[in-house]
Amino acid sequence: MKVHKGDTVLVIAGKDKGAKGKVIQAYPATNKVLVEGVNRIKKHTAVSANERGASSGGIVTQEAPIHVSNVAVVDSDGNPTRVGYRTDEESGKRVRISRKNGKDI
């Protein structure tokens, strides 16, 4: 999967189209990512007693995972781009690059 934790992404499809956010967590097994402030859902939690005796419950708003095909990585210029790879000469490691401008991501 070419989108990693910490990347800034732009939502290109869905109800939050046009929103930018940072990837909180990536789920490679399901090809989904959790983006900060995007795809917010309301989750109903049951009332349960905490260790201090206070009860917690009600409606909680949180982010839900979004499919990786619905987001595009934002490059250093702030434009959405596809991700490519090149091999670094001195270290021999694979480095992610922007397909639009050729710079490292």
From Swiss-Prot:
Region of interest called Disordered, as start-end residue ranges on this chain: 75-105
Gene3D superfamilies: 2.30.30.30
GO MF, one example: rRNA binding
Example of a GO cellular component annotation carried by this entry: ribonucleoprotein complex
Keyword Calcium (UniProt): no
Record has Ribonucleoprotein as a keyword: yes
A single BP term in Gene Ontology: translation
Biased composition (Basic residues): 94-105
Keyword terms of this UniProt record: Ribonucleoprotein, Ribosomal protein, RNA-binding, rRNA-binding
Recorded superkingdom: Bacteria
Assembly and binders: Part of the 50S ribosomal subunit.
Function according to Swiss-Prot or TrEMBL: One of two assembly initiator proteins, it binds directly to the 5'-end of the 23S rRNA, where it nucleates assembly of the 50S subunit.
PANTHER family documented for this protein: MITOCHONDRIAL RIBOSOMAL PROTEIN L24
Family in the record: Belongs to the universal ribosomal protein uL24 family.
HAMAP family xrefs: Ribosomal_uL24_B (MF_01326_B)
Record-given protein name: Large ribosomal subunit protein uL24
Organism the protein comes from: Rhodococcus jostii (strain RHA1)
Lineage: Bacteria, Bacillati, Actinomycetota, Actinomycetes, Mycobacteriales
